[in-house]
Amino acid sequence: MDLLKRHLAPIVPDAWSAIDEEAKEIFQGHLAGRKLVDFRGPFGWEYAAVNTGELRPIDDTPEDVDMKLRQVQPLAEVRVPFTLDVTELDSVARGATNPDLDDVARAAERMVEAEDSAIFHGWAQAGIKGIVDSTPHEALAVASVSDFPRAVLSAADTLRKAGVTGPYALVLGPKAYDDLFAATQDGYPVAKQVQRLVVDGPLVRANALAGALVMSMRGGDYELTVGQDLSIGYAFHDRSKVELFVAESFTFRVLEPGAAVHLRYA
């Protein structure tokens, strides 16, 4: 059976299209991590784990028998529930073009936060180590927005000295992003100065990131594996409400910890 169970929902096709489009706009506009790392998938619901290629010794074995256990990294299945009004959805079939889908947007934003937070800061209970916590490079303090050009240049230099080639992206948490794009120095936007002088990749806003990151986009350093990609499914309904959910299954692996430098920015 299809785990999304959309065919059981009391929702007309046009309303489903409106729901999907609302969520799609959030995903396309807010997802940051998957734009910066290698993406594998989607492989579907049945894909359960990533083969790491590693072995773990087993101590308690028969005499003269060497046994090892293959290691895998399981995918986490994530759901964010939300509720919509049945009458509101039925109005779409009558020609309404602006149904109230705010709860769809909020659920999609929560899913974006879950995925990006796992990528940047890890998710210990799911066996995921994030980019920030994995890097061996010392974090660089950015005391003020005017220090960003120096800090980003220093971070890129650290990566080059470690043999990590570019292009390099600058990933900014919400405060760092807003402050950087609002700042000027001698009448010139600091963000343009950063991009022109010290970053040959994109400047990306990541709402789930604390501070900022300078990271390589050469590929092969970070890997997001997706089973079921971002989808909307049906849970249950009564006469007035229908409960839906945003769902995804994924895991994230850091293959080269030294491919990023964290910038601390209060």
Swiss-Prot record:
Subunit description: This encapsulin nanocompartment is formed by 60 subunits; monomers form 12 pentamers which assemble to form shells. Shells are loaded with 4 encapsulated ferritin-like protein decamers (EncFtn) in a tetrahedral arrangement. A 3 nm gap is consistently seen between the shell and the cargo.
Organism: Haliangium ochraceum (strain DSM 14365 / JCM 11303 / SMP-2)
Domain of life according to the entry: Bacteria
Location(s), subcellular: Encapsulin nanocompartment
Functional note: Shell component of a type 1 encapsulin nanocompartment. Assembles into proteinaceous shells about 21 nm in diameter. Small pores form at, or close to, the 2-, 3-, and 5-fold symmetry axes. Data analysis suggests the 5-fold pores open and close with maximal and minimal aperatures of 15 and 5 Angstroms. Cargo protein Fer (ferritin-like protein, probably stores iron) is targeted to the interior via its C-terminal extension; empty intact shells can be isolated in the absence of cargo protein.
Xref: NCBIfam families: encap_f1 (NF041155)
Gene3D superfamilies, sorted: 3.30.2400.30, hypothetical protein PF0899 domain
Keyword Ion transport part of the UniProt annotation: yes
Keywords, alphabetical: Encapsulin nanocompartment, Ion transport, Iron, Iron storage, Iron transport, Transport
Any one GO biological process: intracellular iron ion homeostasis
A Pfam family it matches: Linocin_M18
PANTHER family: PEPTIDASE U56 FAMILY, TYPE 1 ENCAPSULIN SHELL PROTEIN
Protein name: Type 1 encapsulin shell protein
GO cellular component, one term: encapsulin nanocompartment
Family: Belongs to the encapsulin family. Family 1 subfamily.
Keyword Repeat among UniProt keywords: no
